[in-house]
Amino acid sequence: MKALSKLKAEEGIWMTDVPEPELGHNDLLIKIRKTAICGTDVHIYNWDEWSQKTIPVPMVVGHEYVGEVVGIGQEVKGFKIGDRVSGEGHITCGHCRNCRAGRTHLCRNTIGVGVNRPGCFAEYLVIPAFNAFKIPDNISDDLASIFDPFGNAVHTALSFDLVGEDVLVSGAGPIGIMAAAVAKHVGARNVVITDVNEYRLELARKMGITRAVNVAKENLEDVMAELGMTEGFDVGLEMSGAPAAFRTMLDTMNHGGRIAMLGIPPSDMSIDWTKVIFKGLFIKGIYGREMFETWYKMAALIQSGLDLSPIITHRFSIDDFQKGFDAMRSGQSGKVILSWD
């Protein structure tokens, strides 16, 4: 079958031909319709330090997708041929303390689809049926293909009660923009997103965010004053991994504020911890999605009117995958969809 693989320990992704995956007793065989390119896939393409330590070569990559069930393992219940599905990209062990307690998103033995085992950039994918999520009929293939990153946004945004709150989102990548849109949709008062990438800030404006701020040109405290905010942000969603952005967030949080961190900062990031202590801030780390509460919330948010369509900016045939990766690597894109039909 046709697949996009990391064939060499160097920059690039290559189209290749690989055997179809074998279906296990507890698995689903999924015919891929559409996939989306993730920031992780760009890291793998670039063959950065993380990728060199993590990714086996050769391997089919990718973990954002929607497809159709075409094969069902003999032990599987609850699915039928023709079901339209996406899937949780973190495959968990089922036997550690967190898994047994129902906190599978905190499994210490997680294996990543397209990271530690073959991924979805292929005509067919096999995953455990436990990881599959049926897509409601009124959600498009395009939106279903970005459920994985949308889940990161939803998990982060819904970590805290947002109704009537003032929310700061640092980092206007696709996940940050989606998190800001979720916050606005569920009843936050002011949602402010910051970045230095004007293209992506304009995407945020199209999503109806209260204020998209280019911190290279505007002062965040001036924006707060413009919005009538006198005591700081109630909730912070840190999506950038940029130390300067996190320090600004700490400066502008209200006392008792709550911060959810999805962005991955450098390991040696220094901050003024006295601000955390004396402001009484609560900081929560976010990884992946809650299984499967986040997935049901994603579907419900879209069905209740959340419009994510502006975040999808580029669509290509899989044969033009290089154009898709070029768009993602340029920083001048939202989500990029690759069609396998």
UniProtKB/Swiss-Prot annotation:
NAD(+) binds at residues 175, 195, 200, 262-264, 286-287. The keyword Cytoplasm applies. GO terms for molecular function: L-threonine 3-dehydrogenase activity; zinc ion binding. Zn(2+) 1 binds at residues 38, 63-64. It is found in: Cytoplasm. Belongs to the zinc-containing alcohol dehydrogenase family. PANTHER family: L-THREONINE 3-DEHYDROGENASE (PTHR43401:SF2). This is L-threonine 3-dehydrogenase. It comes from Escherichia fergusonii (strain ATCC 35469 / DSM 13698 / CCUG 18766 / IAM 14443 / JCM 21226 / LMG 7866 / NBRC 102419 / NCTC 12128 / CDC 0568-73). The lineage of its organism: Bacteria, Pseudomonadati, Pseudomonadota, Gammaproteobacteria, Enterobacterales. The gene is tdh.
